[in-house]
């Protein structure tokens, strides 16, 4: 139980530290002019690797380019974030795109169809 609580706490600290580094320190042109939100961090049980999930706005065609730029900058981001989170071993971070808007869009489309059917 305490191990689970510890991982949750470290996940939260990492999410905040990585988000701050992306916002303030990364100067990559495909990253700095995008609205990037670190939605969650999933740390491995041995604390040596972390999956960092991000949502990127504008989302249409630029999200894959921005994700690739984040992956290319992962070591720098980890280095800067390690200054704010003190751990014996700072985890290797891997970025993944979290598409949080697709379920919303799907529900909105369903509601739109229902409204159209009610009118007819």
Swiss-Prot record:
It comes from Chlamydia abortus (strain DSM 27085 / S26/3). PANTHER family: RIBOSOME-BINDING FACTOR A, CHLOROPLASTIC-RELATED. Monomer. Binds 30S ribosomal subunits, but not 50S ribosomal subunits or 70S ribosomes. Its main location: cytoplasm. It is found in: Cytoplasm. The gene is rbfA. One of several proteins that assist in the late maturation steps of the functional core of the 30S ribosomal subunit. Associates with free 30S ribosomal subunits (but not with 30S subunits that are part of 70S ribosomes or polysomes). Required for efficient processing of 16S rRNA. May interact with the 5'-terminal helix region of 16S rRNA. GO terms for biological process: maturation of SSU-rRNA. Keywords: Cytoplasm, Ribosome biogenesis. This is Ribosome-binding factor A.
